[in-house]
Curated annotation (Swiss-Prot):
Name of the coding gene: CCNI2
PANTHER family given in the database record: CYCLINS
Keyword annotations of the record: Cyclin
Region spans: Disordered: 1-116
GO molecular function: cyclin-dependent protein serine/threonine kinase regulator activity
One Pfam family it belongs to: Cyclin_N
A cellular-component GO term for this protein: cyclin-dependent protein kinase holoenzyme complex
Name of this protein: Cyclin-I2
Stored InterPro entries: Cyclin, Cyclin-like_dom, Cyclin-like_sf, Cyclin_N
Taxonomy, superkingdom: Eukaryota
GO process annotations (BP): G1/S transition of mitotic cell cycle
Family: Belongs to the cyclin family.
């Protein structure tokens, strides 16, 4: 009877051990949320977090009942030949074949759905970026009188030593903020340098962790020694006021990353044509091309999505000459007009040719010791 006294609390613990392995991940429910579909139950993962199982005892009622019946049947004289004991004894081996095939669907289903889920997720990100770009994009023609000065200051920013280890997206957002400013208002040439480094500081405030954002004095020491902290702060307020305190728009790098992922996901054999078959190295190379094109004064009139689309389609034409299917698919998803695309493509090709002999290096080098 001592063992019978311990039986009532055992069904829940045995139920947990039956559905969760000793090394099971406590955050298994997060995968279901990320994938957007419920994962199939398996012996390796619990269907609900521990806190929810205590509130929802009937979630796995059939399994709980069978396990309870099996454990309760053990102390009730199983070898006396009684009919109830024989039935409960048969129920234990009968339940084993039902659980045996469960791991197989779990290992197959996420892999079968993974491609579709990733593509849907990418298209969702693309749509959000396009909507935000359409809402914030003002358009307009760049100032012709600062054409050379603009290219010079952008190339200077790209040559900067990355003293504070800013990310690629931070530098790209800085160029985007600077370009939006020049489209929105006329900026005198003598203020271009100050506006450039201020755009970089604003981009760092948006993208970087708070502990990695340098103080104004440290920032001016490395990037703007000609300006006082007060001058930099006044320029920040001027840019924020002109851009309505809404700095984050879908950057060209955002669109480039999404387009590249869509191509690799929809056309997997493209990976065989990439340098070292490494998508990350390929994106880094395209990012350098993109940033160099953002130094082109005439390209300020195009949206970031259009510029990124042209960069990646030119690369696809180089890798797969004469094969138009991936390019047509991207053009449909990007929702870019034919005239805008053709005009931007011509200017991008000119810009890339003019920068082929340039000694400009990207700004993602570590500072010298």
């Amino acid at each position: 009877m001592a063992s019978g006294a311990q039986l009532p609390p055992q069904p829940s613990s045995s139920e947990v051990s039956a559905v969760q392995s000793p090394g099971g991940r406590p955050g298994a429910g997060l995968e279901e949320t990320a994938l957007g579909v419920p994962l199939p139950p398996s012996p390796g993962e619990a269907p609900l977090p521990r806190s929810n199982r205590s509130r929802c005892p009937g979630t796995r009622q059939p399994g709980a009942a069978s396990l309870h019946a099996a454990s309760a049947a053990v102390p009730v004289r199983p070898r006396r030949g009684t009919a109830p004991a024989g039935k409960t004894a048969d129920a234990v081996p009968a339940a084993a074949p039902e659980q045996a095939p469960r791991p197989a669907p779990q290992s197959r289903k996420p892999r079968n759905l993974e491609g579709d889920l990733d593509e849907r997720r990418l298209l969702c990100h693309l749509q959000l970026a396009q909507d935000r770009e359409a809402r914030l994009w003002r358009g307009g023609k760049p100032q012709d009188e600062i054409c050379d000065a603009f290219e010079e200051v952008v190339l200077w920013l790209l040559r900067l030593q990355n003293t504070f280890y800013f990310s690629q997206s931070t530098f790209n957002l800085a160029l985007t903020i600077f370009g939006r400013l020049l489209i929105s208002v006329k900026v005198k040439e003598k203020y271009l340098h100050c506006a450039t480094i201020t755009s970089l500081r604003l981009a760092a405030k948006v993208n970087e962790e708070e502990e990695f954002i340098p103080q104004v004095k440290d920032f001016t020491k490395h990037y703007g020694s000609d300006y006082s902290p007060n001058e930099l702060l006044r320029m920040e307020l001027a840019i924020l006021d002109r851009l309505h305190w809404d700095l984050y728009i879908g950057t060209p790098l955002d669109f480039l990353t999404i387009f590249h992922a869509l191509v690799v996901l929809s056309w997997p054999h493209v990976l065989e044509l990439l340098p070292q078959r490494n998508p990350s190295l390929h994106v880094a190379s395209l990012t350098r091309q993109l940033q160099h094109c953002m130094a082109g004064h005439q390209l300020l009139q195009f949206k970031g999505s259009t510029l990124a689309l042209v960069i990646i389609t030119l690369e696809l034409e180089r890798l797969m000459p004469g094969w138009c299917a991936p390019i047509s698919d991207l053009l449909k998803k990007a929702q870019v007009g034919d005239m805008q695309y053709s005009c931007c493509k011509e200017l991008v090709m000119q810009q890339l040719r003019s920068l082929q002999s340039s000694s400009c290096t990207d700004n993602f080098v570590s500072p010298a010791n």
